[in-house]
Amino acid sequence: MKSYFFILVWITSTIHSFGYEAMHEKTPVGTIKILNLPKRTALEASSKVSYFDENNGLFRKLFRYISANDIAMTTPVEADITPGKMRFFVGAEDLEKKFTDSNEVKIKSVPTIKVVAIGIRGGYTKARFLENEGKLYHWLSENQKFEKAGETYGVYWNGPFIPGLLKRSEIHLPIQKKQNPKKKNQK
């Protein structure tokens, strides 16, 4: 019975990974590391409520948009938590296509960014987000080279139909190098 379970897990996770262009590599589960993310074109849906209160509504808005405009799905998607926003990224093959804002989706240019990231396994819950966000803030408090440069956001690698125990995600905290403090008595 155990072997059937592991075969099912392997098949489900393998099938899900086919066909999607990855915008960057996954951060290994439990690992905290610095990533330099490139400039990207995003499709963004927003809500007045928290991402965790949206019940996949943001995902559905974006999915309808990419389906209507024949844009390939990429992974991961990003989500600002409060207020809720979700971003799909446009892959290399679709960048030349002409697409415009809709009532539900806005096109955004996302600049290059340096983040500290933590890899996570499990369902996409507020409790899991807050627990791992705390680990990033602890890392930042222990690291004297960097300071916060923006708000944390979720990075989700799997769609809503993948079982929670198979899901992978990350939390990113934008950072920048600390400015050298001016020395007293320096002219």
Stretch-by-stretch model annotation:
Residues 2-187:
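A solvent-exposed interaction/effector surface
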